[in-house]
Amino acid sequence: MPRTLVTNCGEAARHFVGDGDYIAKAVVSGGFRENGRRYAIFTTPVTPDDLPDDAVRSAPVIYQERIANRFDLRVTVVGERVFAARISIPDDDKSEADWRAVDPARVAYEIHELPPALEAACVAYVKAHALVFAALDFIITPQGDYVFIEINPSGQWGWLEDATGVPITDAIVDCLITGAA
């Protein structure tokens, strides 16, 4: 996992990001409305100059070391079932800190086979947090290393089904019907 800090203290945030290559992202994804328009909040590069106290204190933010990536990976765990989807963007879009900020027509999705040990670790991690469902995000580095970024206990999955055909909804229904975890 990259170096990570969650804070709403400007001094702590500035000290943490220092001279390094860091990103900032919302603790809760979403967006906001202004003048009748909806805006998304994406992960963005950040420097100490971006973090005056008054801009940081209103809500906690996740600050994380930026990791070079070959592609992103969303791993959805439902009970004992694991679905992994590779999320790729063209090299000329790699300057974006968040693939969601890239033109959706340029984002490619495909089913990804996890190493068995990582798949088992994902299931164990979800269970250790007393969850039956969770979405785990990883970055795959240019060297092929898997770097865990975060776990989301209410991660979206419909878009992955649409893009790859993975049967996440069926797995959730099975879990609900059987009570299996």
Regions found by a protein language model. Give the residues of each.
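A short linear hydrophobic-aromatic micro-motif
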Residues: 3, 61-62, 133-136
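C-terminal active-site "lid" helix and adjoining low-complexity regulatory extension at the edge
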Residues: 110-116, 120, 124-131, 140-181
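FMN-binding flavodoxin-like domain, especially the glycine-rich phosphate-binding loop
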Residues: 3-7, 11
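Generic enzyme active-site microenvironment
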Residues: 23, 135, 148
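Hydrophobic anchor at the start of a short beta-strand
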Residues: 1-2, 22
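Phosphate-binding site of ATP-dependent enzymes
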Residues: 10-12, 17-114
